[in-house]
Amino acid sequence: LIGLVSKGTCVLVKTVCKKVLKQ
């Protein structure tokens, strides 16, 4: 789920993108 949402959230929220990339 995080992988799919990560792509969508990454564009909307850069902070979440960085957090997901680190995880």
Curated annotation (Swiss-Prot):
The keyword Secreted applies. Keywords: Allergen, Amidation, Antibiotic, Antimicrobial, Cytolysis, Disulfide bond, Hemolysis, Secreted, Toxin. It is found in: Secreted. GO terms for molecular function: toxin activity. It comes from the Eukaryota. Its main location: secreted. Dekan et al., 2017 and Nixon et al., 2020 report synthesis and functional analysis of heterodimers with different disulfide patterns as well as different A and B chain monomeric forms. This is M-myrmeciitoxin-Mp2b.
